[in-house]
Structures are given as structure tokens and as C-alpha cells.
């Protein structure tokens, strides 16, 4: 029993307050990245060939390529990847890109073309593999290594392709009239806008160019005026009836009309409805039922109608009237004169059906398809004379050519849904029907039927993840390549070439490199802590190529939308100009194949909530009524209340329980990972929750990580999915453990083709992108049995597999002498001395020795004019030792650079005479520690160019590395031997031998004792009589030999890589990288924060004895200002304080029971208390089943404080907190009497005290504060530069000048503006004066004045400073005279 628990005891056990069971598994948090890129690359080819997506689709869309004459064709067959040349760690160390070579099989077909008939016949086919550049691979953690740094490709949110209907909200025209518009957005290709103007004419725009009447576009599609009208309007037939006319009666047309003149039945002549009455829908229907067929109409009723068809004299072909002409007396007379007895008019009543298309046709000057095409051509290519062919080709290529225009499957699906079409989703171009449907829909909207689209709805925005972004980029590269290939195919003798000769893969490789190196979406990974990594990978940006820009994005795009629920976090977004444009994916959300974000829901069947989970996108969700996860359910899963709060079509409402058909899976599905880590999130104001989730990402990993007492249950998930903590790949038994690696002998998922050993290399003191320290520590001991997925090593900011960003500290909420004014934080010295908030940061320094014009630079210990004292940390090669403590200005790597010949001073001549050449012609360009940094050297790496001789240090590093590799190989070999020989012994034990090693009698039974007499390598010589078994033995032998060969080959390959020279930038001969670890204790000026957006700066560190203390002498660690709570409305921190206090109280109780156990050896009270704290639930293994060792292990783990989990929106309530405080024997007020550490007197009233989880943020005073001594000056103004990086000064600005003026400090002011800033001559004189010990100096003219004079001269004003002072002043007239 102890064996099975030895490991479980080392997982953190939490008391769960959540009441809602978790039905759905949370998807892997970096699935977004990995799934997308895997789908793009498809490294392994499936058995039926690859489907048409990702890289395959790109190749399929560009190939086959034909030359201009059609005499040859280059076809794409398939692609495959070679294994990557370097693994992830090697790429990190050598500044390389982690990638795999892409090999593409191409087929060149050459045709014979018959000159007479033009028939083609195949003349020659050649197939060849062509190298097409390297494809970056994704690491297991969803990142890319580009030039040695880890980068993340952020997913982009953009407007989904498809058709959108919108209006201008009445802003365009002064009358406030709504102008409707439709826009067809393809995935790539020209946009088509169709819009109304203020006069209700319909216009079309292509690619936001000049507008054309929409009918021009329809004519270009091959329609004429009559066809256009018949498409958009029904017709009504007026039939001549004596002097009057009759029209067919339809209830649909007449309902809701107010009758102007009597309605007369055309057949009987009776009045069916008198003038002035309104015809209701019911009355209209009744009239039809009574048998009203037609009604009388007068000529006045005809006036103002429009003809539905041309009136033509068929004998002569003369057109009297055209379709669409308005009927007036003259037109009617013409109609009657031609003897027409039936007139078809358009069914337009200007109320339900407007005459927009007819009016557009009337203003359109184009009459035919040719004119329309020419008009479009002139708009798209102004200045070029159109011909019918070129106009037709251009129009076709705009919307109907799959090379140029692609709606994408998403666009087609969206378009079908919006317009009720049924085209296949393989039809990726526009069709005539689509354009007609769009115009029809737009006219319907204008007539007041239908709804406009909401572009901020997540059904209309989709996510482009890595794979898709990469696909687009690679397509661009291939298209650039295509042009070059076509030209080469035409210019070269095609019969003699191979595919290789036609292809230059540079453009494709360059496109990939450019994307990873410089795209706005390829970002330097935020690696401050595991949470910031995971959040960065789950980020959704609306910016970037093809997206929005900060300046143009309005309020609507940034705002929270009802469809964000369960898809995008409403809380986590940056403060500042990017607010709302950069979002985070919600915890349970995933992206579907069309790029829409889906959220999971439980199905409700017949009023019972089931455990079936469905994922729905925003569009699919709109038709459902969805209950919240915290709705009360009975035993059978039915709703308790008659009416249930639910969401339907973006509104929150109370619905009868029968109508509810879905339910949320978890309360935390609406927030992101970072927000789900904040306990009592529901009690915090949204603005502070936003700061809280953003600041957790800036928490620096501390030297001793400690998981929070008050967690939310998300901590282990983040630690596991981020890859910070190492999870076992398969079950097994721990064979070896040390600080740098864990060796596990696998017992589960054994695969003959793979090794039976898993070696996990731990990262020790590696530098992250943000210079924080990545260090992993093993959690297992030799002999532990572990299962797949168990956490076997902790990483940065993790504690027993839980995310641990900060520390639990004892907080008192009270003012203390003004030291916590304005959110300042007062700390106890104990926190500094116990290294509670100490972190390690690793700085990287790099120096390169180049080949210069004057000769090569050299890395050496032999540096001119440097004392032996300054070289004490360098080895003979001139590189600092590992472990050396270095200070500002210390030499890390000695380097000398040849300098040009200049005339020599006598001293130099003397030196040259004594020491020979060396002394004069080199200068010291060593790499030194920058000012203000102290630390310890933890690692040195030396890189040499191929063929450059290695120095002693490089050889030593190489030897170490090879020893490490050999140890790995030997361990793996030993475990392999143990496994294989164990199996061999089992197989032949007790069998009769048919043969054996030398001196062995045939026919003897083989026993284990007998085997021990021979060396293991001779056991293979035993043969048994059983043929089947003998076959198995031989198979085992060959498998063993293969494994051995593979191991050796792998080892030799790695050694060869270590010994080989490195790829270097041009001109670099040798490069040294030095890593210095800096220990940063917390100090005044450092920024700290809790998880609820309660941030502050450390103002003072007090001696422990001055801190307020409790009756039992416990001192507070930290004092916060209580005024920081009410106005900020983040009450969550107070609840956390109380609950943390209860946790610590419980822990103390368990500590006392442990002492009792040590004295009496009675474990029962301890067991009972732990069973009371951790009741049986489905989250943890029941404590009742623990054996004594496990109970003790758990007790030791929780004696500082019991860990609890209070999930967001489903956490502990006030009653739970009170119950815990009571259990711990504490006051339910959560307040205690505190005593002043300085006087020992109690404070006037009780103070809230408890444990809060505090973080130290990555805004450290050491990185910010700096002081300038002598440094660089700006070239033009001659003023000191600004900023710490430039070693700059502080700007003495306009307002500071006013301050000194107000004090009347004239001399100080003059000094500030001259000698301390940009009076070039003056500052030199001051320096000399100070050196002499003299304190008189004179200010001159500041350089900025000269700049002003020059500026004025550039404007044509010649200004000169007249500084010739009168030598003698004229004598004043004497008063006596």
C-alpha cells in the first residue's frame, strides 16, 4: 500500500468548495496552437494520401504549372519532411531555427504538339525530389524556435468571409435616413459592395472604387433591362373592359390598404367595399373566399405604374415603349392606339415594394452588356482603352476565376446560410445567382423586411490560427516562385532539364522566414512565468495584416458582446490603446474547422440535464435557450424551479423549464485561464479583475515557490499544460534521479520499436526570454512507481505540480504611520531575511571576435594596460570562470582589436622598443559587466567557426558535453540489457537445450544457476528444441541488436554535432556567451500585487520587532492600507484574507496533532481531523483509504496551511468561511487584537488579519532606477541622452525650470541650462576646475541656442549673436559739470 501512495502523497490535495460537478474535460490549453499547425504540416502521410488542406492544398492550388506555349507541365506529386538536423535544445543554444527540410516530389511532363491539328501527346515524363527550403517545426509546448529564441504565433480574429448587410445608422445623410449596404467579402480577391444612396438608387462598388449603378453589374452578367425587372418584380395584368380596366384580385396585395374609391366587383358590378374604409387582412381573405375574382380599375389607377415589358410592333420591329417606362396619359394613349387589350405593369406600390431597381435602371446610361463591361473596365483600369475581350477577361477574373477569387469553404457556408442558397461548399467563386440574391436581399431590407447583420457577433468573426496564417504566407511564396518557373520553362531547352533545374526555392523559403521573423503576429514569447506563456499562446488579436488598426477600431469592436459568453474572456484584455482588440480564449472554448469559436454545453432532454456535451458556435447557439451552470437540479437532473434563468438570442430571460434545451458545463467556462485563477472573482469589480488577471502574468518566479492556500483548482491544469512541470509520458518505475535528469524504466505502453527507457532532462538555471530563471527540480525518488501523466518534476513557479506564482504572507489591514499611503506596502524585514520574495534573474552577455580590415580580433587574457587584479576571474583563454562573482565593470571576456596606424607618442615608442609589436597596435575591447549589475557566472558557451582552432575552454566544454551524452547512452544501454536479458532468462529457464556455449552438454535442462556460470553475452548461444520458442529467441536477439545499433548511432550523431564547428554570421570567427545569475531580494521600489488587482509599491522594510504582532507574538509580514478596498470594490481580497486565516489556523491545529503523534505514536486524532477537513468527493482520492505513511506525509504538507480550492462563480460562500474559521478555533469576524511592535500597546480596535497570496511583479526597481555620471551626448543638441539604456540623464523640462524660477534660484538655474547640459566648452572647463579644486567657473552659450539660430536661418532669417561686448563703457557725465 505504501508503495502506491508514495507518489500520490506528493501531489497537492485541496479541499474543494465547488458544488457543481465537472462534466466535461477541459481541453488542453495549448490545443489551439498545436492542432492548427499539425493540420497544416501533416508530417505523417495518412494511408489514403493527404486530404486537400494545409500545405497539401497550397501545392495543389499552385501546381500544375504550364509554360506559356503549353508544351510542358510541372506537376506536384507529394511532399515529405526529413528529420530535423538539430533538436530543440541544440537550436536554442546555437541560435538556430528548429526546422525540418521539406522535400517535394515533382513530375515534369513534356508534350509533343502536332503543328497541324494542335493535338498533344506525351513525349517525356521525369520525376524528381526537390528541396523546397526548411519548414519551422512547433515544439511540444506550442512555440517555435527562430534564431535561438522562442516565439509564439498569435491567432488572429478577422471578419469572416461571406456576405454582410448593414446600414450607416443615419450618419451619412443630413436627413438621418438609413442607407442600407451589402458587402461580399471573399477570403482573397476583390470586395463587392452594393449600396443605396440618399435618393434610393442602388449602386455597386468593386474594391471601394468609383460607384456604378447596380444594374450595370447585372447587365455585365448578361441580363437585359426586361430580364432585370422580371427578376425583381412580380407583374399585374390590367385587362381592357369596355371603357374601364379590370385587374385580378389578390388578398395578399390588398390587405392593409385604405380604399380611396369604391371597390367594385368587375364581374357583377356590385360595390364590395366603400371608399374610405381600411381593408384588414381578415376582410381581404373573406372577400376572396366569397368568390371575388377581379375588380374594376380606372385609367387614373394606371397612371404612375411602370410597364413590365417592351411594347413592340412585331411587323416593323419598332419599339414603341420600353420596360420600366412610367405610364402617363401620353403613354396610355400610345398603348390604346397600338390596340393593346392587356397591359402588364410592375407590381410596385411604393409601400411594401419600392421602385429602387426600376429607378436605378432609369438612371443607368448603359444599354447593353458590352457598354456595361466597358464601364466596369474603365473604373477598374482608368486610362486604358477597353476592348470586348480585355473587358470580358477582366470582369471574369474579378469574381469568377478561382485563381484570383476565393470565398473559401467558410465564406460559401456563410453565404448559403444568409441567402438561403444551396451551392456546394466546393464552389468557391461567385455565381450570377449569388449576386442576384444579394441585391434581392438588400432591396428586401430597404422595404423593411429582414434584419441587418451584427459584425461584432462571433458568428461573423473567425479565428485564423498558426496553420492558416502559415498557409497563406507559403502560398504567397509559391506564387512568386511560379512566375520564375514559367519564365524558365519557356527560355530553357525543356527536353534536357530535370524538375530541379526549373525550381529556385528561395522565394518560398524567404516568405516563411519573413513571416516568422517580422510578421506582427509572430511575437517574442512572454516567458515571465508559466501562466504568461499559456496566455500568450491562447491570445486572439484583432490587429495584424488583414486585421484592424488601433486608430481605426471603434468602441463597438472592442466591446464585450453577448456571443463572447464561453468563447472569449470578458475580463482579460490589456489596459490602454489595445483594450478589447487583444483578447483571450475562454477556458473551455475551442476553434472548429471553419475557424469559429465553439463553447461546450450539456444537452437537456425532456427537462432532464444529461451528461452529453455538445460544442456549438455562436450561430448554432442562437436558436437555443441555455441555462446557467449553477441552476439548482434535483437528484434526477431535473430543474427544481418552474422558471429558469437562461440566455436566448443574446438576451437573458426567465424561461419555463420545459423550454430549456441546453445548459453550461461549468461556471468558469466564460472566463480565461488567468481570470479562472482568481479566487472569489465573483466578488471583485470587473476593472480590478482585469488588472488582477493581467498582473498574474507579470509575476516573477521566486526562489522558493509556494502554492496558494486559497486556490481555484485551476493551478495543476496550468502547470501541466504549460509544460513547466514535467508529466510522465508513460507509466513505469523510477530508475535514477539526480538534479539534472530522471530515468524511468517504462512498464506501460511498451513498444518493441521504441526504447523501454524514458530519460527526462531537467532544465537547470536556463534564461527565459524575460531573463527570469527556468529551473526544474525532481519530485520522485528511486523506486517510485508512477503512472502516465503524473507530475515528476516541478518547474519555475510550480509547487508539487500546482502553479505557484507568489507566496502566502500574513497581512494586517491597517494604516501604519503613512507608510501605506496611496497603495504603498509596508514589509517586514523577516520577508527579506527568509528570502520569501527573492528571485533569480539570468542575464546573457555575448561577445564576438570578428575578422576586421586591420586583422582579426582576438579573445585572450593578454590585454594591454589592464592590471592583474582585473584579470583575476579569467582563465588562460580570457574567459570568466563559472562560479565567479562579478561586479560592475569586471571583465567577462577579454578581447583585443587591431587599431589603425597613427603617429606614435614617445611613450608608445618606448613601449614598442621594450615589448615588441604587441603593445601599440591593439586596443582593449573586452566585454565588461554593465553598471549596476552584480551576479554570479552560471554558464559559458563558446562557439567557433568551422576550421578555427578551438581554445582550451572550448575543448573543456566539449568534453563535458560528450561525457553527459555518454552517461545517457550507458544508462539507456544498462536498462535495455536488464530488460532484454531478463526476458531471455525467463524464456529459456527450465527448457531443454539443443546447443549451448563451449563446454556445454546438449540435452541438459537450462536453469538460472547454470546461466550465472556464463557471461551474459554468451546466453544467446543457448538453443532450445522447441522451434517456435527458438524463433522468438532469434527475434528478440535481432531486436536487441537493432536497439543497440540505434543507440550507438544516436550517440555518435550527437557527438559529431558537438565537435563540429558552428554556423556563424559572416565575419565572425568566434563567439562567447556568458550567463550571469543575479539574485534580487525585495526592496523599496519593487512592485507587488495580490490576485485581485490590488497593486502597490514597497515603501519601507521595517525591522521585525516594529511590526504589529498578535497576542501569541506572531508578527505581521505585510501591512496594507484598508482604504484600498472600498473604492476599488475588490472585496475578493478580504474574503481571501479570512479564508487564508482559517487555512493557516487549521494547519496550526494539524501541526499540534503531529507533535502529539510524535510523543504518543497515536495517529487516530490526526487521521480523524484530516478526514473531517477533506470529506469524500470526486476530486480527490478519499483520505480514508490512506495508510499511515500517506497520512503523515499529507499532515507535514499542510501544517503551514491547509490548501483549499474555491472555483470561480462556484466557490466558498460566507457560511463556508465562517464554518472553517470556527473549525480552526478562530473568531468568525476574522479580526484580532493587534499590538504595536514599537510600544507593545494594543491598537484601539481589532484589525482584520489573515493570509493573502502576494506576487512580486516584473517591475523591479533595480531595472528602472539609474544615475548618470559621464555618458554620451546627443549629436545635434549636445544634451545628454535620455533613458537607462543610453546611460542618459534626467530631463530638466519646462515645468522644472518654472519651479527654479519660482524659487528665484538664478545660479542653479543657469547651471542646469548650461554647464550641466549642453554648454560644450563650459562643461569641459567645469571638469578642469573641479580637478584643480577650484570652484569658480563661467557659463557659456548653450548648444541648443546655436541649434535655434540654425533653424531660423533655414527659414531665411539671418540671425547672428553679437557677442563683441564694448571693451570700455563710455564715461558717465560728471555730476559736477
Curated annotation (Swiss-Prot):
Q: Does the keyword Nucleotidyltransferase apply?
A: yes
Q: Which GO terms describe its biological process?
A: DNA-templated transcription
List, alphabetically, the InterPro entries matched: DNA-dir_RNA_pol_bsu_ext_1_sf, DNA-dir_RNA_pol_bsu_external_1, DNA-dir_RNA_pol_su2, DNA-dir_RNAP_su2_dom, DNA-dir_RNAP_su2_hyb_sf, RNA_pol_bsu_bac, RNA_pol_bsu_CS, RNA_pol_bsu_protrusion
Mind listing the UniProt keywords for this protein, alphabetically? Answer: DNA-directed RNA polymerase, Nucleotidyltransferase, Transcription, Transferase
Q: Which reaction does it catalyse?
A: RNA(n) + a ribonucleoside 5'-triphosphate = RNA(n+1) + diphosphate
Give the CC-aspect GO terms. DNA-directed RNA polymerase complex
Disulfide pattern: none
The entry lists its GO molecular-function terms as:
DNA binding; DNA-directed RNA polymerase activity; ribonucleoside binding
| Family annotation (Gene3D superfamilies) | 2.40.50.100, 2.40.50.150, 3.90.1100.10, DNA-directed RNA polymerase, beta subunit, external 1 domain (2.30.150.10), DNA-directed RNA polymerase, subunit 2, domain 6 (2.40.270.10), RNA polymerase alpha subunit dimerisation domain (3.90.1800.10), RNA polymerase Rpb2, domain 2 (3.90.1110.10)
Membrane-spanning parts: none
The EC code for this enzyme is: 2.7.7.6
Which Pfam families does this one have? Answer: RNA_pol_Rpb2_1, RNA_pol_Rpb2_2, RNA_pol_Rpb2_3, RNA_pol_Rpb2_45, RNA_pol_Rpb2_6, RNA_pol_Rpb2_7
In the record, the note on similarity to other proteins reads: Belongs to the RNA polymerase beta chain family.
PANTHER family in the record: DNA-DIRECTED RNA POLYMERASE I SUBUNIT 2
What does the annotation say about its assembly with partners? The RNAP catalytic core consists of 2 alpha, 1 beta, 1 beta' and 1 omega subunit. When a sigma factor is associated with the core the holoenzyme is formed, which can initiate transcription.
State its role. DNA-dependent RNA polymerase catalyzes the transcription of DNA into RNA using the four ribonucleoside triphosphates as substrates.
**What is the name of the protein in this document?**
DNA-directed RNA polymerase subunit beta
User: What is the scientific name of the source organism?
Assistant: Brucella canis (strain ATCC 23365 / NCTC 10854 / RM-666)
Instruction: Tell me the name of the encoding gene.
Output: rpoB
